[in-house]
Amino acid sequence: MRKLACIFALALALPARAAEQKPQDVLPTTPFKEGDTISYADVDKLKDYLPPQFWENREFFFYEGMQLTVGPTERKYGTSDAYAAATEKHKGEAKLGEDGSLQNYQGGRPFPNETIDCKGDPNAGVKIIWNFNKAWNGSGGNAAWSYTYWDRGEQLPLYYEGTSRTVQLAHHVEPQYAENDGDIFPNEKRLGAFGIEVEAPFDARGILVLTYRYKSADGALKEAKNDDTWVFVPDLRRVRRISSAQRTDSVQGTDFTMDDLRSFSGIPPQYKWQCLGEKTVIAPVNTKTLAYPYTDTYNFGPYGFSYASDRWEVRDAWIVRFIPKNEDHPYHHKDIYIDKDTYEPLYSFAYDRKNELWKIIWHNHRYSEDWNGKVNKDPKAADGVWYPGWEGVDQPKNLRTVSDIIVNVQTGTGNRIEFWNNEGSPLSTKGKIRAYIDIGRLNKGR
């Protein structure tokens, strides 16, 4: 069951999001300029542009020999034209309902940035998290992944490798789905399906997981349906249905819960949300160096938890806090830094029931249009296509999470999940989609 718990968490986490531009953006004054290199001797320059909790635990992340490259300030990554059009078409339609639920949502960004008043609107926090939840993410996700467990620089034996796919079933913005109101199939009740296939280690090889999340999860708690999850275990040669209701339980052998991945992968109405403010931060946003599955030469630092030898950018971020409505939740609260342009997660900080800092979670990202050379080029090349367009989306224009790192600051242990080839193009036909999300696929063990 320990293996299944870890793998189930990964199934929910892995590829498992466009923003309005201000008419005249005024860039903040910072000590950084594009092309600068920051070494360990210079890290004090970063202090005012990092979350204080991150700076106080910087020994996990900054190290002798690091070479941090400064990228552009507040680059506008945008989104696909189709997502931007859906945002404009449905502007003003989405509303908040009971329990902070999302009502009347059809597609695109639910709440335009210019309508969010962090200081004056008590609902600003929940609006931000819905924008995060519904941000542009292509047609889902597809990746090869690696999961490793670390203890202050020592890689522990627990590890997994495999592939995963997220299939978005509702709220599509491509024109071909307009007749079904954005759904792939008529009368669809699911938001999406999430699958994972384990390839290593040998004793876990062949495990398959499939999870459904339902549209009702966006609604009031009294109407919400929990995720359904099935797992195929080769040793048992049968499919088991497992409970996914306890998403907040710590996964055995790890330092995170299922809802920790991507900083937050839970169900928003199960939490109270606050907007704590806005901050200009520097963060690893658009990697210039590849890692798993392309190579094992990425420098994660002496603790195995660092992106310091990569490209970082100055970004404007929302800071939101969730407070669990469930008194049995392991967290007192969590603070999440969310990029205001892309709604990608930057940093988050989870506090235990004693209100003491417990975990730091941060991420790296990769932008589709910076790797847009010839389709037949090696995707490992700097101009090699790894994320092509598809019908209705010629250019994905998608900044995607390609790695999650979770650090338990109380023990020095942590987890690293790498999926650098994460991309959001869909399966080529509805038939292939049906086959992938069919529970019967698990019975066949493939």
Residues of each region from the PLM?
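Solvent-exposed N-terminal domain segments of exported/luminal and surface proteins
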Residues: 20-226, 233
